[in-house]
Amino acid sequence: LIISLNNIPKDAYLKENELMLYKEKVPNDKFGPVSLGYKGTKIAITTISENRAFISVAFIQESKETLGASTQGAEGGNSNQQGNNETSDLEDLLDKPIATKVIPVDMYNDVKIDNLVFTFEERYLIVEYFNSDSVKRMKVYNSTSGDLIEIDFNSKFAEDKYNIELVDFKKDEFNINVTSKEDVNNIDSEITGKYKVEIEEKTIKKI
């Protein structure tokens, strides 16, 4: 058990609410998409209620990886008793959440979360989602603080016209493919295509 719904924060700020004047109740009827980081130290979690979604990052307790070594016991002794102890330890592990802390990342209204992806070093979290116009979009966050990285996808690619899809990524950069939404007028063919996004520089360049 990584985390239970009871361990999810009860309320949080929307990142689009720049003044942070008020919190909103966190949607937590059920779990949505989740994603484990490449190092195994973080897991991104979605909880949802109808058309609302909440993203958080749980930090994994590394010591659980040593369960096998810690349950082998000393040499000799009663093998049945040792086996019973190992079973008990395993049951305790599975019953208890192994997340050491949970940080809120963001809340979304009128969207469907499609995918959560950590970069290789787990420094950043990429969130792919469908907005209220059924257009695929994305946001990028610092996975330790939960802060939104201000990469201006919306001014470059209109939210109601252009899909943004993750293709691949390296350490602190990734490639996206921009396509037009079907049955939409006034599409600029110069905008569609592949781009490189540099997270540190917060730049988007066509390739």
Feature-to-residue mapping (PLM):
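N-terminal "mature head" segments of proteins
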Residues: L1-G32
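Acidic, small-residue rich beta-repeat scaffolds with periodic aromatic anchors
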Residues: L1-N7, E159-I207
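Beta-strand C-termini and the immediately following turn/loop, strongest in propeller blades
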Residues: I2-N6, A44-E50, F59, I126-S132, ...
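Structural motif
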Residues: I3, N51-F59, T66, D133-Y141, ...
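Beta-propeller fold detector
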Residues: S4, Y13-N17, T66-V105, L148-A158, ...
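Surface loop/turn motifs at the tips and blade-to-blade linkers of beta-strand repeat domains
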Residues: K23-N28, V105-V111, F153-D160
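Blade-terminus and WD-like Trp-Asp/Gly-His loop motifs, strongest in beta-propeller folds
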Residues: G32-I43, N115-L125, E165-N175
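Short helix-loop boundary/capping segments
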Residues: M107-F153
